[in-house]
């Protein structure tokens, strides 16, 4: 890296540059950077030396910028609607809030085994019980499980709780929040991802778990079903196996079976179902929410 003083001018080819009158070396590079024309293509090196990836691949640098814009937008939206940001414990004596395997550690001074949290849910609920009616946390979770394009042992999640709101209120709220995040991040509500245009501007599609399963799974066999499995779990398996990947545009899936939603409130119109939704975009689950079961 060098510091240059001089006067701007254009070359014979019209390129804007600087006629240097003074330069100072600010720092040396002891190792040569990858070829700027071909970039850094080795995936192992890109993941393990992300700083080099940022130098030579502008699109990766832009992803960091977009992530910062997105998280800032989410925070502004929540705080504009009277949500308070909190931080809950990372080290917990008991883990909960999700079905996942935790990382374990040991506190030497207390001679106590602890777990890195897998979710902030239980502590956020305690804050609601304590009188904070709108709280959220955007922070790290840790799950000692496999690695894939959709799963990482360390990841950031946004979790919020709104006392006295229904899951239908949360659907409307989440739709507006994500639409605003797309605009603040990309300058418009329509974004292109992996060659597909995703439209956050139009109303999100809504269909029930049963409707999705009937649309894409009816008449098709599912392997791995245990004898005596409940109707609700079979419906969920059919949805996950056949329907999930078909949900490309932003879509709320509602009315999940009671058997696969133990902490959600039963629907008053059908006690076999619950007041719950999941949001899907490009075949991936982005959100899971429900009206809490507060009278078991």
Question: Residue ranges of each PLM-predicted region?
Answer:
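Metal-assisted phosphate- and nucleotidyl-transfer catalytic regions
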Residues: 96-102, 180-284, 291
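Alpha-helical structural motif
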Residues: 70, 120, 131-134, 170, ...
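Class II aminoacyl-tRNA synthetase-like tRNA-binding/catalytic domains
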Residues: 1-169, 179, 224, 261
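TRNA-recognition modules of translation machinery and tRNA-sensing kinases, especially anticodon-binding
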Residues: 116-119, 130, 134-141, 152-157, ...
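Conserved hydrophobic/aromatic pocket- or pore-lining residues that grip, position, or stack substrates
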Residues: 23, 78, 82, 212, ...
């Amino acid at each position: 890296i060098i510091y240059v003083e001089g006067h701007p001018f254009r070359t014979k080819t019209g390129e804007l540059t600087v006629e240097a009158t003074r330069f100072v070396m600010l720092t040396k590079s002891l190792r040569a950077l990858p070829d700027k024309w071909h970039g850094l293509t080795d995936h192992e090196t890109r993941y393990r030396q992300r700083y080099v990836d940022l130098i030579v691949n502008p699109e990766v640098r832009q992803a960091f910028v977009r992530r910062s814009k997105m998280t800032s937008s989410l925070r502004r939206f929540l705080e504009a609607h009277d949500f308070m940001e909190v931080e809950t414990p990372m080290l917990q004596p008991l883990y909960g809030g999700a079905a996942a395997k935790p990382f374990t550690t040991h506190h030497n001074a207390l001679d106590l085994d602890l777990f890195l949290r897998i979710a902030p849910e239980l502590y956020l609920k305690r804050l609601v019980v304590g009188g904070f009616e709108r709280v959220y946390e955007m922070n790290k979770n840790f799950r000692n499980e496999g690695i894939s394009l959709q799963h990482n042992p360390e990841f950031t999640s946004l979790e919020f709780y709104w006392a006295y709101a229904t899951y239908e209120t949360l659907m409307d709220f989440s739709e507006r929040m994500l639409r605003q995040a797309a605009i603040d991040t990309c300058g418009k509500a329509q974004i292109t991802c992996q060659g597909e245009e995703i439209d956050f501007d139009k109303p999100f599609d809504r269909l029930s778990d049963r409707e999705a399963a009937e649309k894409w799974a009816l008449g098709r066999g599912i392997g791995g079903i245990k004898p005596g499995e409940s109707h609700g779990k079979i419906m969920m398996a059919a949805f996950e196996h056949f329907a999930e990947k078909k949900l490309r545009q932003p879509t709320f899936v509602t009315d999940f079976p009671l058997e696969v939603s133990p902490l959600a409130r039963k629907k008053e119109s059908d006690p076999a179902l619950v007041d719950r939704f999941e949001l899907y975009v490009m075949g991936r689950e982005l959100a899971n929410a429900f009206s809490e079961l507060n009278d078991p």
